[in-house]
Amino acid sequence: MIFVLDVGNTNAVLGVFEEGELRQHWRMETDRHKTEDEYGMLVKQLLDHEGLSFEDVKGIIVSSVVPPIMFALERMCEKYFKIKPLVVGPGIKTGLNIKYENPREVGADRIVNAVAGIQLYGSPLIIVDFGTATTYCYINEEKHYMGGVITPGIMISAEALYSRAAKLPRIEITKPSSVVGKNTVSAMQSGILYGYVGQVEGIVKRMKEEAKQEPKVIATGGLAKLISEESNVIDIVDPFLTLKGLYMLYERNANLQQEKGE
């Protein structure tokens, strides 16, 4: 069984794969202040609930866009799982040809998504990941990672509206009953949701025009389903794209180590 961990700025998503299939997954808040023991006990509770144990896990891979948390997570893996985790970063074999000016600037989550997207859906491809920041990644027909777009996530937009406008409340991100709001909350929900849908459609349209291709558009992340239901540019929603990519990278690198006799 392989344990995969994707650490984002707001939430961390954990999963266990068995024989190539995602057996279970969990979501927890990203907390930069937790120790390796606190993380260890939290993960133990999650595993216990599914009838699993640390001993069932034979390998671990971690992707993180929050560097301060990595020390505690790596220590947790070594102390409780007795396994040194594979970390997505310099040295890991991704198989990607990254055309960024500085490839090291590409976030680990974007690399993982690209690996999974290419293997599962082919190329050319645009991957939209709705996280704390929303990222758009373009992979061309030769499977080269060409770059992308980064925008504030939908929750950041909603929080900015709440924090900077004294009389506006904090709202739940959900579809309102009509585009024209009949009260402050529904008007804000309409503005946030449909404003964001318009942004997604506009950016994807411009990316396609610049690429002079019609790449398939894959959406992932917490709000991917909600946005896709209102948009006409998203072809596939894959909520576990990142976890699948982590598993693929683990298998790829574990096989390479076996070939080298490590």
From Swiss-Prot:
ATP binds at D6, V7, G8, N9, T10, N11, A12, V13, T132. The active site is at D109 (proton acceptor). One of its GO terms (cellular component) is cytoplasm. K(+) binds at D129. Its cofactor is NH4(+); K(+). Keywords: ATP-binding, Coenzyme A biosynthesis, Cytoplasm, Kinase, Metal-binding, Nucleotide-binding, Potassium, Transferase. Pathway: Cofactor biosynthesis; coenzyme A biosynthesis; CoA from (R)-pantothenate: step 1/5. One of its GO terms (biological process) is coenzyme A biosynthetic process. Gene3D superfamilies: 3.30.420.40. A monovalent cation. Ammonium or potassium. It catalyses: (R)-pantothenate + ATP = (R)-4'-phosphopantothenate + ADP + H(+). Its main location: cytoplasm. Its EC number is 2.7.1.33. Substrate binds at Y100, G107, A108, D109, R110, T184. It is an enzyme of class 2 (transferase). It is found in: Cytoplasm. Pfam families: Pan_kinase. The keyword Cytoplasm applies. InterPro entries: ATPase_NBD, Type_III_PanK. GO terms for molecular function: ATP binding; metal ion binding; pantothenate kinase activity. It comes from the Bacteria. Catalyzes the phosphorylation of pantothenate (Pan), the first step in CoA biosynthesis. Belongs to the type III pantothenate kinase family. Homodimer. This is Type III pantothenate kinase.
